[in-house]
Amino acid sequence: MATKTSNLGHLLLSLFILLLFILSQVGVAQAKRLQQRNKLRLDCVPLPPPPPPLRGIVKPPIASFHSASPKDKGP
């Protein structure tokens, strides 16, 4: 009798593990399919044009240092 119970326990445990494995594989397949669907959906939507440049922003001047060479001194 103990052997039958042990075999039944192993059978139920094996079936439970098999069920978990199948459910995990189904979940992985659904995730891949959803990811591909989202990727295709994003490929079909055109990107909006970039915003126009702001004209109110003044660019800082580029620093120019005077040369110390003799030809720039003048008369």
Curated annotation (Swiss-Prot):
Q: Name one GO molecular function term.
A: LRR domain binding
Note down the stretches annotated as region Disordered: 51-75
Cleavable signal peptide: 1-31
Its keywords, alphabetically, are: Apoplast, Cell membrane, Cleavage on pair of basic residues, Membrane, Secreted, Signal
Q: Where does it localize? A: Cell membrane; Secreted, Extracellular space, Apoplast
Motif SCOOP motif: positions = 61-75
Expression by tissue: Mostly expressed in leaves and seedlings shoots, and, to a lower extent, in roots, stems, siliques, seeds and flowers.
Gene Ontology cellular-component terms listed: apoplast; plasma membrane
Residue positions of motif SxS motif essential for MIK2 binding: 67-69
Q: Its induction, per UniProt?
A: Accumulates upon infection by generalist herbivores such as Spodoptera littoralis. Induced by wounding. Triggered by salicylic acid (SA).
Effect of inactivating the gene: Increased growth and fresh weight.
Provide the GO biological process annotations.
defense response; defense response to bacterium; response to herbivore; response to insect; response to salicylic acid; response to wounding
Oligomeric form and interacting partners: Interacts with MIK2 (via extracellular leucine-rich repeat domain); this interaction triggers the formation of complex between MIK2 and the BAK1/SERK3 and SERK4 coreceptors, and subsequent BAK1 activation by phosphorylation.
Q: What does this protein do?
A: Brassicaceae-specific phytocytokine (plant endogenous peptide released into the apoplast) perceived by MIK2 in a BAK1/SERK3 and SERK4 coreceptors-dependent manner, that modulates various physiological and antimicrobial processes including growth prevention and reactive oxygen species (ROS) response regulation. Inhibits root growth. Prevents general growth and development. Exhibits antibacterial effects against Pseudomonas syringae pv. tomato DC3000, Ralstonia solanacearum, Bacillus subtilis and Agrobacterium tumefaciens, thus being an antimicrobial peptide (AMP).
**What family classification does the UniProt entry report for this protein?**
Belongs to the serine rich endogenous peptide (SCOOP) phytocytokine family.
Name used for this protein in its record: Serine rich endogenous peptide 4
Q: In the UniProt record, what gene is named as encoding this protein?
A: PROSCOOP4
